[in-house]
Amino acid sequence: MPGEERERFLAGLHVGVLGVADGDGRAPLLVPVWYRYEPGGDVIVQTGRETVKARLLRAAGRFSLCVQDENPPYRYVSVEGPVTAVDDPVDPAERDAIAHRYLDPEEARAYLKSTAGQLADDITFRMRPQRWRTANFAAFAAEFSEADRIDRDG
């Protein structure tokens, strides 16, 4: 994917899969996350201060995030980079923005109200994408579709 397309795709509404090294010699920890990204900026994720994810993010100092389109033609963007900042405590405006990104306004208000008590226990990690990996299978899907048509009509 060209640069602008990949940035727009990452900024789109997806549940991301965050990956972070596990220093215990195990496979990386992979977890679904809500995130926020604006083209040219940092990837922003929030988690509980005492979670395994937070501990591993602090230790590794970097993480990856992968987002995908689950509908044909399939596409994905994966970014990896260093943690550029840890906001502790969470900025309530940032938490609000992430909730409103994933939920309609009424659901977001209810979610934020019901989880207000955990605000003091959450932290924000910011990552500046350094490596990008992308794929857009639209061309493959078009070729496959054309080959299938030729086989049927052939």
Regions inferred by a protein language model and the residue ranges of each:
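A generic secondary-structure signal marking the coil-to-beta-strand transition
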Residues: 6, 14, 41, 75, ...
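Extreme N-terminal tail/first-helix region
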Residues: 1-15, 143-154
